[in-house]
Amino acid sequence: MKNALIITIIVLSLAIISYIFNKKEYITCTKKTMNEDYTLLSNYKIYYQNEEVYKIEIKENVEAKTTNILNQIMQNIENSYKNYKEEIGSYDYEVKKEKTKGETKVIINYDEIDMEAYLKYNPEANLNENKKYNIEDLKKMYEERGAICK
């Protein structure tokens, strides 16, 4: 009976430790960009585990002054995303537009992308020895570019 209690305590302790050290968390960052032709609201949900970023979900809403401006913006965005997906993989995106409003959704899974190809597009990326972003470094980068992160 005493051995069973000891084994139960050990198993529970290991489960708790495993949960604490493998806990998946996220932060959100938002940025609003405005000029005379359009307003862009960007929302980033950054998932990390053990301080390493493994996925980012991006949702952007664009409201343009005219349909032509929106079409140009959305075409540029879609071309960029298409190139990223072809070059680095695991870059899932969706682009929608209606009149003068557009929406994009992107999911970047850093565990599945070709990081060498990614670095060609993002040579300034500050990655750790595992070729991953550290959550604090990525948060700092977004904040330096005007985003508010929580």
Which positions does each model-derived feature cover?
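Short amphipathic alpha-helical segments that mediate assembly, nucleic-acid/protein binding
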Residues: K2-N3, I135
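Sec-dependent N-terminal signal peptides of Gram-positive bacterial secreted proteins and lipoproteins
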Residues: N3-N22
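Subset-of-secretome marker
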Residues: K23-K150
